[in-house]
Amino acid sequence: MRLKGLSSALVLAGVFCVTAANATVPVKGHPDTPGQSADRVPNGRGWGVDPAGPTGRAKPGGNGISYHGGPIMLNTVGVYYIWYGNWSGNTATSILGDLAGNIGGSPYFRINTTYKNGSNQFVSGNVAFLGSTTDSYSQGTSLSDTAIRTVVTNALNAGLPRDANGVYFVLTSADVTASSGFCTQYCGWHTHASIGGTDIKYSFVGNPDRCPSACEQQTTSPNGNAGADGMASIVAHELEEAVTDPDLNAWYDNRGYENADKCAWTFGTTQTAPNGSQYNMTLGSRQYLIQRNWVNASGGYCAVSYP
């Protein structure tokens, strides 16, 4: 998920500058339209990059996003949390636990049921919160991408189930950063890797209390914990992208934007909570401010519920 306030135009301008600086990178042809540059592909962090090689042939759906042939996550998707760092006494564990326990089957998450695979099988829209564990700084306080994968591997080796239909979230406390660009390039990301012979989908989401101006929508929040409430929207963003584009080769547009990227930092109609903060949905007994997601129907549009 890209930073707050970083517009699509700025993201693309920055990527094009990098491409121009690397004169050895060829301009690739579009697989469907000769003479047109190729679709960019997602990097799981909120913007697209040039494909390193041949990509799946896009099947335009007329809804502003195309299917590229890769798998999607069917049936009930498992969510697993790895609480990295120091979360002692922090209400984030209950706020985000309640999010994972109630987002499945909600009008919000049913937006993802508008996505299907090449066999005409649709995302179910069901989610189950299946487990969590803690990691007290095993990889230090500045995590490389490799270290984040190691955190996931260690959690699996320590007892979390190896679930090919699950998404594992590495949730870091505010004293932890990610050296590849947390707070400077992104607020969260998702990817996948073969771990112990299983295709594991996992995500990094940092605590936006570390950089409120970049990764928090508001500093007063409906659950009284701005960092956790900010993480809730980022977790939702990465979860819906992992479900519809788990291996970064399924659903995205010609800029390399996945479904949630297309609606990042937009929230639709909001209401005011008693403490003055804004929220746009209720999941279980809690109010949340969660970004909109892209509906893959009726021409495509951002929404907080479907149908």
Residues covered by each model-derived region:
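Bacterial N-terminal signal peptides that target proteins for export
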Residues: 1-9
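Bacterial N-terminal signal peptides
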Residues: 8-17
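Sec/Tat signal peptide C-region and signal peptidase I cleavage site
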Residues: 19-23
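N-terminal carbohydrate-binding/catalytic regions of secreted carbohydrate-active enzymes
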Residues: 25-153
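Loop/turn elements at helix/coil->beta-strand transitions in domains of secreted/extracellular proteins
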Residues: 75-79, 106, 163-168, 198-201, ...
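Active-site-proximal segments of metallohydrolase catalytic domains
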Residues: 124-193
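Metalloprotease/metallohydrolase-associated module, dominated by Zn2+-dependent proteases
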Residues: 185-229, 245-307
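Active-site recognition of the HExxH zinc-binding catalytic motif
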Residues: 233-245
